[in-house]
Structure formats: C-alpha cells, structure tokens
Amino acid sequence: MPTVTEGRLIAKGMKFGIAVSRFNDFICSRLLDGALDALTRSGAEGKDIQVYRVPGAFELPLVAKKLAVSQRFEAVICLGAVIRGATPHFEYVSAEVSKGIANASLDTGVPIAFGVLTTDTIEQAIERAGTKAGNKGWDAAMTAIEMVDLLRQI
C-alpha cells in the first residue's frame, strides 16, 4: 500500500498574509470576510493574519511575492475580482494575474492561494462571493491552510 500524505485543516499557530484588491470592493470585501472566517474557524488568531489592500487584481502578484519572500508568513492568500467588460482588458488582466501568482508561489516555495474571481458577469461574481456558489475567499483560505500543513510534512 502506498503512503498517502495530505494537509490537515488546522490553522492554529500558522501565519497568513492576505493581499486583497480594492477594485470591485463590493465583491472583494465579501471574499475577505470569507477568508477571515475560514482562518479563524480553523484556529488562526487575529494577530497571525495581516491584510494588505492593493489597488487592483493586477497588483496582487507583486505584493504576494513580496509577502512570501519576507519570511513572515507561511502562506499568502490573494483575493480579487476581474469581471469581463466590453474590451479585451479582462483577458490580459486575468491571464497575467493567474501567471503572476503561480510564478510567485513557485519562485518562493511559499503557498500562495488563488482567490481571484474571473467571471463574465457581476452576478457570477456575487454568486461566488458568498451566495449560491459558496465563497471563494473561504476556499482560498482553506487551500492555504492545507498547503502549509502538507509542506510541513514533506
């Protein structure tokens, strides 16, 4: 039988940095609420969570990487919302944010959870920020907790 290792969802004693976009704040504030709720319900204390507000989703990768290399956090959580409009701006921003966050995590070895919504409509974003489709901020926080614990075991 193979040995299977997976992270536990216990955040006690873990330190988290959260980078959250101010753009589309009516969505991002709900994502932040979900992430904070997940962290505290899983045992994290307020003193172990730092929130950093960035202008928009495009700025998330840089701040995430800076937080990761600071060695003050065991995981970083990125929260934002990119909603499609009438121009190709959506494609450029969502692609660069996704790549930038992934690269920051791979470059630093620090888990950086992706809680950035990329939706076609405002309604879809609202659904994913705490209504019909759950809260992706919560999901990103749970991913961060699990990854910290898993990496501790490796």
UniProtKB/Swiss-Prot annotation:
The active site is at H89. Keywords: Riboflavin biosynthesis, Transferase. Catalyzes the formation of 6,7-dimethyl-8-ribityllumazine by condensation of 5-amino-6-(D-ribitylamino)uracil with 3,4-dihydroxy-2-butanone 4-phosphate. This is the penultimate step in the biosynthesis of riboflavin. The keyword Transferase applies. It is an enzyme of class 2 (transferase). One of its GO terms (biological process) is riboflavin biosynthetic process. It catalyses: (2S)-2-hydroxy-3-oxobutyl phosphate + 5-amino-6-(D-ribitylamino)uracil = 6,7-dimethyl-8-(1-D-ribityl)lumazine + phosphate + 2 H2O + H(+). Gene3D superfamilies: Lumazine/riboflavin synthase. 5-amino-6-(D-ribitylamino)uracil binds at F23, A57, F58, E59, A81, V82, I83, F114. The lineage of its organism: Bacteria, Pseudomonadati, Thermodesulfobacteriota, Syntrophia, Syntrophales. It comes from the Bacteria. One of its GO terms (molecular function) is 6,7-dimethyl-8-ribityllumazine synthase activity. Its EC number is 2.5.1.78. Belongs to the DMRL synthase family. This is 6,7-dimethyl-8-ribityllumazine synthase. (2S)-2-hydroxy-3-oxobutyl phosphate binds at A86, T87, R128. InterPro entries: LS, LS/RS, LS/RS_sf. Pathway: Cofactor biosynthesis; riboflavin biosynthesis; riboflavin from 2-hydroxy-3-oxobutyl phosphate and 5-amino-6-(D-ribitylamino)uracil: step 1/2. NCBIfam families: lumazine-synth, PRK00061.1-4. GO terms for cellular component: cytosol; riboflavin synthase complex.
